[in-house]
UniProtKB/Swiss-Prot annotation:
Organism of derivation: Drosophila mojavensis
GO cellular component terms, semicolon-separated: eukaryotic 43S preinitiation complex; eukaryotic 48S preinitiation complex; eukaryotic translation initiation factor 3 complex, eIF3m
UniProt entry tagged with the keyword ATP-binding: no
Subunit description: Component of the eukaryotic translation initiation factor 3 (eIF-3) complex. The eIF-3 complex interacts with pix.
Any one GO molecular function term: RNA binding
WD repeat feature ranges: 4-43, 46-85, 141-180, 184-223, 281-322
Entry protein name: Eukaryotic translation initiation factor 3 subunit I
Amino acid sequence: MLQGHERSITQIKYNREGDLLFSCSKDQKPNVWYSLNGERLGTYDGHQGAVWCLDVDWETRKLITGAGDMTTKIWDVEYGTVIASIAAKSSVRTCNFSFSGNQAAYSTDKAMGQNCELFIIDVRNADSSLSEQAPTLRIPMVESKITSMLWGPLDETIITGHDNGNIAIWDIRKGQKVVDSGSDHTAGINDMQLSKDGTMFVTASKDTTAKLFDSESLMCLKTYKTERPVNSAAISPILDHVVLGGGQDAMEVTTTSTKAGKFDSRFFHLIYEEEFARLKGHFGPINSLAFHPDGKSYASGGEDGFVRVQTFDSTYFENIFE
């Protein structure tokens, strides 16, 4: 159990090797932890508002964060210093490095008279001058705001999940939408996470389901049904398993006993769509989930401000569907 945030966790992410776990919360300070023993290595101090999103690049050199103080910041992971701070006109809701680490994308909220927009910036030679440079691409979102985002294969596309349940793929060379999912989800998308090989991704939605989609055609492959909104979902890198986390909206939560089972991590079989396990722990909804890159443990971040890292025992790796 990692205790270091004063307010609810908004997102957690492992780096590629899995030795570091990054977490951000509404208390303005993203943290980095040793995933093996839960030791806090440091804090990235500089935001003036709730930090909504973060991502770490392939080489664990740069960290990008987006916050309610209307800035996106790029940090030096090792030294904790701000490399660049980019101002936006509303809260920054999502941010992601591309696989190559040459580009980063972030999106802003529809608020204060501003439309939601998707920005792509070049971060190859990131320094303080980045805040003055124009983004390499800027796409206004007219219909519905972006609530989650992924880079597609070969850094050629961006997949966006929206507040109205829609999913779209954008070609960043043309700057236009190339695929639209239609209305597979009937409510907002809270989270999207790719499979290890990038061919599929799982969505978590307020419509109480998580769905598995093809990364290129946006065809819905599988549906995992629950009784309450799903805040986060992740795909195991080694087994055909999906973990879902959620609960009620934060504002609807009363002090419920954990026995009610509302705030469990729920494991589903990727192919058979069957739930086979639940893990308790959080005293509130789970806001973010991440599998360790080796698939032997996973982490969850909750509305209670804690990050829990849980290691699987040997029985988890036995095929229970034989």
